[in-house]
């Protein structure tokens, strides 16, 4: 009997670590992007939970009027939020060691900067990890490209907008009612509802929901029956089966007759590309719109654009929106400003000229 002994290659500790990091056999793929993603997202999540529960009030406007955001200071799940870093800090990098004490750091809203910056790094690395895993498996890279839309949106509201406005205090609070407050103030100051890029984003999100529901219902309605009436239709599918699980010809015929022939896709690949591209492109445009409005390139202004032969203004919906904007603007940060910026101008802006 002949025994063949194969000599095992001796690899360094670093080599074994690299192989483990990049192995696609792990239950959860780590990857080099994951090396940065894991600690940053863990940090952001941990600080968010602690601050949401127990952070003391924050002087968001820099006028010695702290705003409470945590559960232990009287909020509930809906009203609670991580309050943005104080206007007194502006855009300064404000880690814990830059403050005279932890109490001062908390009072000035240091946790917000810590959470946001770690979160943005983490989600960017998550996107890179999606690409990395796709690359290792020989897949195409479009999963990471699709994920770039929410990454761009988060970057716009948490980083680009504060940079444009000159302070992290203008960033979106990390909470439910804080998000709504951010949206209302954004409308008041930038007229986002009249910005074409926001309109494209609305079309992307609502259209994506519609197309997703249409596709799912069409596929579910044209499944190829593999079971009896006493069994679930889902039992007729085996993971990895070669044959189609639904009849795309039947779905195409149904939808083509419901609308018209060319409204229905006859190519499954182009259909799924469309389903991915529509919401992604819409959200890209919205993120781009937020990023331009950050520097005060605002939505369209059609105020008092319709007048009669005597020069009297005939109100349009644009004027109704403008009146609502002024009302929202005078109500927010009411102790920080005596008047909204529009009303505090020395000379009234030209409307018709």
Curated annotation (Swiss-Prot):
[CaMn4O5] cluster binds at residues 170, 189, 332-333, 342, 344. Its main location: plastid. It holds the Pfam family Photo_RC. It catalyses: 2 a plastoquinone + 4 hnu + 2 H2O = 2 a plastoquinol + O2. GO terms for biological process: photosynthetic electron transport in photosystem II; response to herbicide. Fe cation binds at residues 215, 272. Its EC number is 1.10.3.9. It is found in: Plastid, Chloroplast thylakoid membrane. A quinone binds at residues 215, 264-265. Keywords: Acetylation, Calcium, Chlorophyll, Chloroplast, Chromophore, Electron transport, Herbicide resistance, Iron, Magnesium, Manganese, Membrane, Metal-binding, Oxidoreductase, Phosphoprotein, Photosynthesis, Photosystem II, Plastid, Thylakoid, Transmembrane, Transmembrane helix, Transport. The D1/D2 heterodimer binds P680, chlorophylls that are the primary electron donor of PSII, and subsequent electron acceptors. It shares a non-heme iron and each subunit binds pheophytin, quinone, additional chlorophylls, carotenoids and lipids. D1 provides most of the ligands for the Mn4-Ca-O5 cluster of the oxygen-evolving complex (OEC). There is also a Cl(-1) ion associated with D1 and D2, which is required for oxygen evolution. The PSII complex binds additional chlorophylls, carotenoids and specific lipids. Chlorophyll a ChlzD1 binds at residue 118. GO terms for molecular function: chlorophyll binding; electron transporter, transferring electrons within the cyclic electron transport pathway of photosynthesis activity; iron ion binding; oxidoreductase activity, acting on diphenols and related substances as donors, oxygen as acceptor; oxygen evolving activity. Pheophytin a binds at residue 126. The record marks 190 as: Stabilizes free radical intermediate. Residues 345-353 form a propeptide. It is a multi-pass membrane protein. Disulfide bonds: none annotated. The modification Phosphothreonine is found at residue 2. The record marks 161 as: Tyrosine radical intermediate. 2 of the reaction center chlorophylls (ChlD1 and ChlD2) are entirely coordinated by water. Herbicides such as atrazine, BNT, diuron or ioxynil bind in the Q(B) binding site and block subsequent electron transfer. PSII is composed of 1 copy each of membrane proteins PsbA, PsbB, PsbC, PsbD, PsbE, PsbF, PsbH, PsbI, PsbJ, PsbK, PsbL, PsbM, PsbT, PsbX, PsbY, PsbZ, Psb30/Ycf12, at least 3 peripheral proteins of the oxygen-evolving complex and a large number of cofactors. It forms dimeric complexes. This is Photosystem II protein D1. It comes from Illicium oligandrum (Star anise). The lineage of its organism: Eukaryota, Viridiplantae, Streptophyta, Embryophyta, Tracheophyta. The gene is psbA.
